[in-house]
Design a protein with these regions (language model features):
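Nucleotide-sugar donor phosphate/pyrophosphate-binding loop at the beta->alpha transition
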Residues: 19-24, 32-49, 88, 92
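Short alpha-helical donor nucleotide-sugar binding micro-motif in glycosyltransferases
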Residues: 168-169, 176-181
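Carbohydrate-associated surface elements
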Residues: 63, 85
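Aromatic "clamp/platform" in nucleotide-sugar-dependent glycosyltransferases that forms part
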Residues: 189
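Nucleotide-activated donor-binding/catalytic signature segment of Leloir-type glycosyltransferases, i.e.
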Residues: 149-169
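Conserved donor-binding/catalytic core segment of Leloir-type glycosyltransferases
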Residues: 100-126
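Short His-centered aromatic/hydrophobic patch
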Residues: 3-8
Length: 198
């Protein structure tokens, strides 16, 4: 039985109890990562219960592994780091044309627009950069509970004319955004092992 992250742990634990089969959980992040240290006791309890019942705990990074061992008091012998990986890109994606940016550079944030990903730092940094030069465009691609706040923040800083918010991206759109970028910025305040840089 394989359960991914805390929302599936109760089902995984139940399946283990009913079937008698071993449970392996996959920890992509803990509430310590998602909450900037303001851990929700309910979420922590669900995470800990899943880990306590797991026969094997796979973590996306050594950082997450240490958090699981130290903060959730798990036996290090059952906790392993299993890093995310990617497949090589298809020729179609490799052949996406790169626009000419000789007059204007593009700086991109691509990810969930949530507290954990630090989008406000991207907007603040953009405001500082744009005080020095205006030949840069900023792209904040993604969706999340902070999207409207980031749109408002860009407007309040007087930089909305240099910002583009294309929304959630998937498939080929993601590669087109990357190919159109001169710089990718990942201002995450906690990133156990992000998919975006892969």
């Amino acid at each position: 039985i394989h359960a991914h992250d805390w929302l599936t742990y109760p089902a995984g634990v139940h399946a283990k109890m009913v079937s008698g089969k071993p449970l392996c959980i996959h920890v992509h992040a803990t509430d310590f990562d998602r909450s900037r240290g303001k851990v929700n006791p309910t979420v922590y309890s669900i995470e800990k219960n899943g880990m306590d019942h797991a026969d094997c705990i796979m973590c996306v990074s050594e950082l997450t592994r240490r958090t699981v061992i130290n903060e959730y008091h798990q036996d290090p012998r059952k906790v392993f780091a299993m890093h995310n990986a990617v497949y090589p890109l298809s020729q179609e994606l490799l052949d996406i044309p790169r626009p000419d940016h000789s007059k204007e550079k593009v700086v991109t944030f691509l990810g969930r627009i949530t507290m954990q990903k630090g989008p406000e730092y991207f907007v603040e940094a953009a405001a500082l950069v744009l005080q020095r030069t205006r030949n840069i465009r900023f792209v904040m691609a993604g969706s999340g509970d902070m999207l409207n706040a980031m749109i408002n923040m860009a407007a309040e800083r007087g930089i909305a004319d240099r910002f583009h918010f294309p929304g959630f991206m998937k498939g080929k759109q993601v590669y087109e955004v990357y190919k159109n970028s001169d710089v990718f910025v990942m201002p995450s305040v906690s990133e156990p092992f992000g998919i975006a840089p892969l």
